[in-house]
Amino acid sequence: MELSRRICLVRLWLLLLSFLLGFSAGSALNWREQEGKEVWDYVTVREDARMFWWLYYATNPCKNFSELPLVMWLQGGPGGSSTGFGNFEEIGPLDTRLKPRNTTWLQWASLLFVDNPVGTGFSYVNTTDAYAKDLDTVASDMMVLLKSFFDCHKEFQTVPFYIFSESYGGKMAAGISLELHKAIQQGTIKCNFSGVALGDSWISPVDSVLSWGPYLYSVSLLDNKGLAEVSDIAEQVLNAVNKGFYKEATQLWGKAEMIIEKNTDGVNFYNILTKSTPDTSMESSLEFFRSPLVRLCQRHVRHLQGDALSQLMNGPIKKKLKIIPDDVSWGAQSSSVFISMEEDFMKPVIDIVDTLLELGVNVTVYNGQLDLIVDTIGQESWVQKLKWPQLSRFNQLKWKALYTNPKSSETSAFVKSYENLAFYWILKAGHMVPADQGDMALKMMRLVTQQE
């Protein structure tokens, strides 16, 4: 046992040394790709539509990557980049300053970042008609990519494969998971699909919108008058959704957010304990005031590609990858990705989650305590609408407290799990759980992937 422990420590030291030696001082990025540690490529998913992916092999010093799961991370928006934000701001091996991240998931899983839908991050389209306009197209494109990936990387075909997601990425993950299950059953894709995790996910938009008023009122961010205003616009959103007027519902959703901003003095939709930091240059433009979609895009996509991250991705990272076309800039098409999905925003996918549960797919829902845009109350609301036969038994269970380590006395989360449904309440976290509570997010990932 002592010899094994020493070997692990030596391997870990060598691994950290190899990472550090790969960087020069300052912001320049000139590390050498380590054999078998990282690979990336494009896949043509449709005519005029190319999707970019980036794979990191797990770096656990005591285990081979084949002994650990493969996790695909899907960012939100739509239009948020997994290879950028998810990688360098949340779970990847390095942060935006290219410093090692202590809570990287790469210790316990190989990580596959995909810029999805097409037009996101380094993915791109050659014509405007090639942007995805609905979840069906998003899922179909991903099937093309996953088939290509698993066909080319057969070493991952038997490794447990999990899809983790965030925000709108969760809505896409639900649809992708269902299509992936079908493809596996039909034999068109070979992989060991083991579950999907929906993080602060836009599964039932109207349930989120309806919960905003009561949630903000309960934490003293709305008074009676403000609650009445928010509740009124939320009912208008509900009516539009019930009538199938999804584009109108999207416009009303944008209006609801403006009403909340005015009544809360600019609460941050991603963490209620902070205030939003608007882009004043954007807000001074005529387009910003005329278009609710532009305002929504400003709030829900542009914050995923701040100046530091954009400079990193379009500078050192683009130079490292070598395969990005000269005329493609990271994040340049993200606004078009967002706007193209306008009619899809407010459509619920509770039925898809229900189908996944019925098929026996492991489904995990996790949510940050301080999130507003997809608050926990709204998540709990749509979960209670599931037709899954085991829901009553799930509800009868008492949740269990979780701690980041055995010696900690501070509660970091709660979890409830029955058969193939689990729900995690992550404390002191906003919308981006791994960014806010990295240790707990890592522990949760290990629990979901059955490593704890």
UniProtKB/Swiss-Prot annotation:
Induction of its expression: By retinoic acid.
Signal peptide: 1-28
Principal cellular location given in the protein's record: secreted
GO molecular-function term, one example from the UniProt record: serine-type carboxypeptidase activity
UniProt xrefs under InterPro entries: AB_hydrolase_fold, Peptidase_S10, Ser_caboxypep_ser_AS
Swiss-Prot/TrEMBL keywords: Carboxypeptidase, Glycoprotein, Hydrolase, Protease, Secreted, Signal
Tissue: Highly expressed in aorta, bladder, and kidney with much lower levels in all other tissues analyzed. Expression in kidney is restricted to proximal convoluted tubules.
E.C. number(s) listed in UniProt: 3.4.16.-
Protein name (record): Retinoid-inducible serine carboxypeptidase
Gene: Scpep1
